Amino acid sequence: VQPEDIFYCHVSVDDVDEIVQKHLKGHQVVTRLLYTDPVSGQAVPYYSEINFYKKQERIILRNCGRINPENIDDYLASGGYLSLRKVLFQMTPVQVIEEIRRAGLRGRGGAGFPTAIKWELCRNASGSPKYMICNADEGDPGAFMDRVVLESDPHQVIEGMIICGYAIGAREGYIYCRAEYPLAIKRLKVAIAQAEEYGLLGDNILNTD
C-alpha cells in the first residue's frame, strides 16, 4: 500500500474492507496480514525491509503496481519517454547501439543473447524495409514475464520498440501476443492510441523526420 510501502500478504477479497476501513481510512496497519520473517518470527511491515527483497532493485518491473497502465500521464510522470527524447535528439543510431552494448543489456529469454549484437546485425543487414518485431509469446510452461510487463507497463514496451526501431533503421513494428492474454492486448491497444495522440508514435515522432 502506497505511499507508506506497507506490504500485506495472502490478501483475499474478504480482507479488502478491513484494509480500506482500518488502513486507508483509520491510518492503522492491519497487522494480521503482514509478512512474518521466518527466522526472527517478527512481523515486517515494509516491503523494502523484507530480506528477500531489500537488496533487489526493480528495473523492468519498476512501475508494476505503481502506475495506472492505461494512463500515459502516469508513465510520463515516472520518467517515461524521456529516453526516447534523448535518443532522437541527442544520439545517432550507432551511438544508441553502443550505449546498449556498454549497458550489457541482454534478452530476457533463457539464452540471454546480447541485445546490442542483435540490433547491430539488424542494422547492418541488407534489404529494405526493416521491421521491429516484439515477440511477447511465452513458450516456457508457466512463464508470465512478458504478460506482466504488457499488462502493467505497456508504454515501456512501446518506448523500447521505438528506440530499437530508430537504432536498426525500422519504420514499422509488430507485437506478437497470444489471444489468451486479452488484458495485455487491451492495454497495448490503449497505450498505442495514447502514444499516437501525444505524438510519440506514428509519423514524425516528436516532430522529427
Where are these regions (language model features)?
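Feature of Fe-S/electron-transfer and energy-metabolism proteins
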Residues: V1-D209
